[in-house]
């Protein structure tokens, strides 16, 4: 079963540096690849001022109104499942949750059920009619914290656009191995590891990624950080922190080879080793409401496991 989503945009002057239809579409709808957009043109899914244009090299003008009828697969292949969601805000257009750990966001290889998507489909059947069931960004399975979900197609496209334009503030708290001397910014491209495809690595051939980090508190052998994402690449924080030799506590994928300090107490060593997940929490989310345009902000306190870890580290300063 296929559903439809209509995208509409007005051609600005800046897009007319190259006024071919396919080039203008690529500049207006950057989330979609040139190949996909060209396919929509040839399939007669694109209208300019209400008239179908099916030639990629057709010329468009300033203030022309372009619309695309996108088709996407409905989520009927996925099962609605009654899974608890910690909802901290909801209206007709958006849903904000505080995601728990050990919770996959979207079905994939090895995770076809028990995900956030399955939970959303159970909560409201209208999510079947929204791309990705309204999920506009992700958190890793064992990362906790704030996520926003779109409840209709208008909100979905508006939130995607805000993320693309870097208008959404996503702030995290993390506990890392090592004593970080000062805050900083990491600007390093990230690419999928060609040897181990489930992981990411820093590589100049990858996608540009920017991570800002600030010190909240230093401990003897660890540091509590505030981290702000400017981009949102897969495993970005975990990959970047490993790159600068301050991997996340509990990260079995990106921190398991980190050497513990020799003078650390045995009690602390055992507790840190037993921490069950990467110590990472999405603590602050700030965005413009997709309909009212009001600036909205949500904050989430650290989960119990991270609070307990900080308390333990405080005792060993």
Curated annotation (Swiss-Prot):
Domain S4 RNA-binding: 19-83
Primary role: Responsible for synthesis of pseudouridine from uracil at positions 1911, 1915 and 1917 in 23S ribosomal RNA.
Keyword terms of this UniProt record: Cytoplasm, Isomerase, RNA-binding, rRNA processing
Domain of life: Bacteria
Gene: rluD
Family listed: Belongs to the pseudouridine synthase RluA family.
N-terminal signal peptide: none
GO BP terms, alphabetized: enzyme-directed rRNA pseudouridine synthesis
Catalytic activity: uridine(1911/1915/1917) in 23S rRNA = pseudouridine(1911/1915/1917) in 23S rRNA
GO cellular component, one term: cytoplasm
Active site: residue positions: 140
Broad class of where this protein is predominantly found: cytoplasm
CDD domains on file: PseudoU_synth_RluA_like (cd02869), S4 (cd00165)
Subcellular location: Cytoplasm
Name the record gives this protein: Ribosomal large subunit pseudouridine synthase D
Cited PROSITE patterns: PSI_RLU, S4
Enzyme Commission numbers on file: 5.4.99.23
GO molecular function: 23S rRNA pseudouridine(1911/1915/1917) synthase activity; RNA binding
């Amino acid at each position: 079963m296929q559903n439809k989503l209509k995208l509409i945009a007005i051609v600005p002057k800046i897009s007319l540096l190259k006024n071919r239809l396919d080039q203008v579409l690529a500049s207006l709808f950057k989330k979609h690849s040139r190949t996909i957009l060209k396919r929509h043109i040839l399939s007669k899914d694109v209208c300019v001022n209400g008239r179908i244009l099916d030639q990629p090299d057709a010329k468009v003008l300033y203030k022309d109104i372009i619309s695309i009828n996108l088709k996407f697969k409905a989520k009927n292949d996925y099962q609605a499942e009654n899974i608890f969601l910690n909802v901290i805000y909801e209206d007709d257009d958006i849903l904000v949750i505080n995601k728990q750990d050990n919770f996959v966001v979207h079905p994939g290889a090895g995770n076809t059920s028990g995900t956030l998507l399955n939970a959303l489909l159970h909560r409201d059947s209208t999510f079947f009619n929204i791309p990705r069931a309204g999920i506009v960004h992700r958190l890793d399975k064992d990362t906790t914290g704030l996520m926003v979900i779109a409840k209709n197609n208008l909100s979905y496209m508006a939130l995607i656009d805000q993320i693309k334009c870097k208008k959404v503030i996503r702030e995290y708290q993390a506990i890392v191995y090592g004593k970080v001397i000062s805050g900083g910014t990491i600007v390093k491209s990230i690419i999928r590891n060609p040897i181990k495809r489930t992981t990411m690595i820093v590589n100049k051939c990858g996608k540009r990624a920017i991570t800002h980090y600030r010190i909240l508190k230093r401990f003897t052998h660890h540091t509590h950080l505030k981290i702000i994402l400017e981009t949102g690449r897969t495993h970005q924080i975990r990959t970047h922190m490993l790159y600068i030799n301050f991997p996340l506590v509990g990260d079995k994928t990106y921190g398991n080879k980190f050497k513990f300090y020799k003078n650390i107490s045995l009690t602390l060593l055992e507790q840190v080793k037993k921490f069950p997940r990467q110590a990472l929490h999405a603590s602050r989310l700030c965005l413009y409401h997709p309909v009212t345009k009001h600036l909205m902000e949500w904050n989430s306190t650290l989960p119990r496991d991270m609070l307990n870890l900080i308390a333990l580290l405080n005792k060993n300063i």
